[in-house]
Amino acid sequence: MSLWRPSEATVYLPPVPVSKVVSTDEYVTRTNIYYHAGSARLLTVGHPYYSIPKSDNPKKIVVPKVSGLQYRVFRVRLPDPNKFGFPDTSFYNPETQRLVWACVGLEVGRGQPLGVGISGHPLLNKFDDTENSNRYAGGPGTDNRECISMDYKQTQLCLLGCKPPIGEHWGKGSPCSNNAITPGDCPPLELKNSVIQDGDMVDTGFGAMDFTALQDTKSNVPLDICNSICKYPDYLKMVAEPYGDTLFFYLRREQMFVRHFFNRSGTVGESVPTDLYIKGSGSTATLANSTYFPTPSGSMVTSDAQIFNKPYWMQRAQGHNNGICWGNQLFVTVVDTTRSTNMSVCAAIANSDTTFKSSNFKEYLRHGEEFDLQFIFQLCKITLSADIMTYIHSMNPAILEDWNFGLTTPPSGSLEDTYRFVTSQAITCQKTAPQKPKEDPFKDYVFWEVNLKEKFSADLDQFPLGRKFLLQAGYRARPKFKAGKRSAPSASTTTPAKRKKTKK
């Protein structure tokens, strides 16, 4: 990007010419060939608050953490269109062109009924009710924590791109060398960016922050986030991404209100300035704790405000990438707290037919989620001119490597060594080192893998999303049965001759 900047003589100089990022529509040609691809029913079940490790091996998880407040990041693998066996290959030239997929339709299906899941903490750092207090609270005791539960902020979110989404959160920063931090001082804060992975926690109403590093009590927020990082999508950063690969488009719906008002127990780190109040007497001589916090609530969930289970058609992406699936992959990020019901499961230890005894039963919590991903892909072609290949190489060299355009080394003119007895123990091993597999740039991140390499179909009318696409695009499916013409009568059949009219 070229910008005008002022010089020392307060004269604005013209910018230096630089290469510009262009839209994929300028070098990608779309065809009239469409495919449908859909996943199987995707299910996951676990504990809504924390993962359960194995008793004899804490590093092994026997029950994962599955919450309605987690991000679901699906990494959708697509087949290579350049290896497709098309019935008619006359629409492109494999010598000078390459094929890519463009996502033009998406539907995220959600099963399970609407419901509100709650969370809480058996030892929440709550001192007093500051909303409707009928007395002035005195000084806190040694331990004033209470068992409190609440519902969370309501969020529905769907992000689509060919790279993982970027999140933001507040974490502990590094102080300057001349600002020494002593125990008990408030640490400096820093806005950090990180990749949103499958299983990361969303903003629940307590802020997008690193609760592990910034809340040492482990009791200021509910159990499911007290030792986690709550991330919020960094829309500003993703929208400003030059090539537009991270975010094609997004759907978002958030709502929250505050249900209760409390304050914390503990010592106030930054006292209220004396010029903000007039000192009291008696029970008000000592100020109450001024560290207030609310309990969030997402309010009512309703089917009238759902963004899922409906198709979306992408005509124009928000960035320069207009839906082209570089690397034959897509990243679909989903959040849906409107189906966060936590199921209560009870198992009997001993039979108690006559009287109820709570110790005879064990109580468990489980949360289950159900997804279904459906796509419509359009086949596109790219003509490999020198300018286009140079531009793609500057954007992402791995794309050309996938198209078998890597650099080939010239033949060596030096003398090479060749041993006679290659299996002899008297010489060094002659086995060639195996070729290293291509390194996955996202191997260090956790995603929900969805393989659609064998799920493509050109029969769009055989799938619900395909029929919706044909209807809105004005296409008609090819008829499966041809209505034949009525057969002509046989030659032996004769028609009676008409009687000639005569005048009298």
From Swiss-Prot:
- Where are the annotated segments for Disordered? 480-504
- Keywords recorded for this protein, A-Z: Capsid protein, Disulfide bond, Host nucleus, Host-virus interaction, Late protein, T=7 icosahedral capsid protein, Viral attachment to host cell, Viral penetration into host cytoplasm, Virion, Virus endocytosis by host, Virus entry into host cell
Task: Using the UniProt record, give the first listed, main subcellular location.
Answer: virion
Q: Which GO terms describe its biological process?
A: endocytosis involved in viral entry into host cell; virion attachment to host cell
The protein's matches in InterPro entries, at most eight in alphabetical order, are given as:
Capsid_L1_Papillomavir, Capsid_L1_sf_Papillomavir, dsDNA_vir_gr_I_capsid
Q: Which GO terms describe its cellular component?
A: host cell nucleus; T=7 icosahedral viral capsid
**UniProt-listed Pfam families:** Late_protein_L1 (PF00500)
Write out the annotated subcellular location: Virion; Host nucleus
GO molecular-function term, one example from the UniProt record: structural molecule activity
Q: What job does this protein perform? A: Forms an icosahedral capsid with a T=7 symmetry and a 50 nm diameter. The capsid is composed of 72 pentamers linked to each other by disulfide bonds and associated with L2 proteins. Binds to heparan sulfate proteoglycans on cell surface of basal layer keratinocytes to provide initial virion attachment. This binding mediates a conformational change in the virus capsid that facilitates efficient infection. The virion enters the host cell via endocytosis. During virus trafficking, L1 protein dissociates from the viral DNA and the genomic DNA is released to the host nucleus.
Q: In which family does this protein belong, per the annotation?
A: Belongs to the papillomaviridae L1 protein family.
HAMAP family cross-referenced by the UniProt entry: PPV_L1
Q: Quaternary structure per UniProt?
A: Self-assembles into homopentamers. The capsid has an icosahedral symmetry and consists of 72 capsomers, with each capsomer being a pentamer of L1. Interacts with the minor capsid protein L2; this interaction is necessary for viral genome encapsidation. Interacts with protein E2; this interaction enhances E2-dependent replication and transcription activation.
UniProt-recorded name of the protein = Major capsid protein L1
In the UniProt record, the gene name given for this protein reads: L1
